[in-house]
Amino acid sequence: MASPGPGPERAVVFFHAHPDDEAIFTGGTMALLAAAGWRVVLVFATAGEQGETSASVGPDVPLAVRRMGETARAAECLGAQRVEFLGYHDSGLDNAAARTTGAGGRPPGAFADASVEEASTRLAGILAEEQARALVSYDARGIYGHVDHVQVHRVGLAAAAKAAVPTVYESTVDREYLHFVETHLVVEATVVAQPERAVTGLGLAAAPLGLSTVEVDCTVDVRPVLPVKRRAMAAHASQIPETSSAMRLPDADFAAVYGYEWYARRGPLGPIDTLT
């Protein structure tokens, strides 16, 4: 595995929509890069204010505060050396069912409604400070269609161009691979975010989710650091409790579902390619 060596352009910036996305989709990659000597920086568009609530979060503890604390613990597990929040509000769900029932209105400051120019300028400032060698964002679908994830894709591309970041990796999932394993959390999220486009009898291979196998440029085997990834996911206990489908998986099934992470690449080979 190649080491970045000393000096500038040794940072890889991971840009995510909400706390817990980093652990689910890129946690193993982050841990592997950190172990190889890369500076791992984590940036969130929102604090996940519209996430799941639970009895473990008291009425005097705003969910955003709880989730930021969980993020700090997960980031420490994964070796991230800097964590930043851009300060936008979680947009919540924006699916047909919500719009039909009148529940589709977004809160003020929602990331999905933010100016791409403004948001990308904020992110580009961090990329420039870090002299980032690569940026990790999401594919054009936002992996599974959540409006904040789609906005991460747009903002990430614009920010990388502004900061002249050489390589952009777009986190995704290989939907054909997931067709053959136990349910991934992203499949459950797809059903919630887009119930009108839920998985049909054709299975995940035809679902509005991720990319096909041939569209994936980098498949990272993160099984060597899977215990680290699992701890990082568990740190987000407000959203991924012990009773969740992911945390209840036996080790072998967890490895099959979460042991690989997938990326499409824009630009030249970069840090994540050294892991494959």
Where are these regions (language model features)?
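Metal-dependent de-N-acetylase/amidase catalytic core
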Residues: 1-13, 98, 106-276
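Active-site rim/loop-helix segments in enzyme catalytic domains that contact anionic ligands
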Residues: 1-131, 158, 264
